Amino acid sequence: MEGQAVTTNPWLIMAINMTVVFAVLIALGILMEIVHLIDPTKKKKEAPAATAPVATPTATPVAPANASAQNEDEVVAAIVGAIVAMGYSSEQIASIRPTATSAKWRLEGRLSGRG
């Protein structure tokens, strides 16, 4: 093998190997960015709809017919408000349900006639 220059320096071999590895990683990163830019499955951005400011109605003290229903509406409104604050729209919320039903919730449902 007199025609080929062979090195036995481990530092040079390490530098060449690491250069190849990082060059491939950079190439993969660029390829991922290109695919991200031309992704045909990505939803198109819709123009933001101009929303008119909603006038807040004045609060009128009315005795609720069912305190449980009002409490449930307030809880749902608080959950929807928290989700909307995180960046989701109210149209994206499919349902609100507890992750695990406890004995207290089951009893509440039976006593209020929903179970």
UniProtKB/Swiss-Prot annotation:
Post-translational modification: The N-terminus is blocked.
Low complexity bias (residue ranges): 48-65
Span list, region Disordered: 46-70
Enzyme class per UniProt: translocase
EC number, as in UniProt: 7.2.4.3
Annotated membrane topology: Single-pass membrane protein
Pfam families hit by this protein: OAD_gamma (PF04277)
Domain of life: Bacteria
The family this protein is said to belong to: Belongs to the OadG family.
Protein name: Methylmalonyl-CoA decarboxylase subunit delta
Species of provenance: Veillonella parvula (Staphylococcus parvulus)
